C-alpha cells in the first residue's frame, strides 16, 4: 500500500514551492514521482495543431515523492503516514501527527 495516493492533499517540503499545498493528480510509482495541482509549474512551448492553439503554456511537472508530505486531515500541516489494521481486517492509513484516519 502506498503512503501517498491520487486525490490526497499534500504539502511540499522542499524546493521552490516549499510550503504549498495541492491535490495529487497522478502518481508515477516506477519513478517515485507525483503530479500535484498548482505545484512545480513549468512553461512549455507548444506547437500549433488543428485542435490546440500554439504558444507558451504553463503546466505541472512531476515532483519527487520525497519532497512531499501528506497534509494532516485535522489541521492541514505535514504529517508522516502510518498503517493500522482495523477489526474487519482492512488496512488503513493513519496520520502520525493527529492519529486521524486518512482513508476509511
Curated annotation (Swiss-Prot):
Q: Which SMART domains match?
A: KOW
InterPro entries from the UniProt entry = KOW, Rib_uL2_dom2, Ribosomal_uL24, Ribosomal_uL24_CS, Ribosomal_uL24_KOW, Translation_prot_SH3-like_sf
The protein's matches in PROSITE patterns, at most eight in alphabetical order, are given as: RIBOSOMAL_L24
Cysteine pairs forming cystine bridges in this chain are: none
Superkingdom is Bacteria
Gene Ontology terms: cellular component: ribonucleoprotein complex; ribosome
Assembly, in brief, is: Part of the 50S ribosomal subunit.
Role played: One of two assembly initiator proteins, it binds directly to the 5'-end of the 23S rRNA, where it nucleates assembly of the 50S subunit.
The identity of this protein, by name, is Large ribosomal subunit protein uL24
Q: Which organism is it from?
A: Chelativorans sp. (strain BNC1)
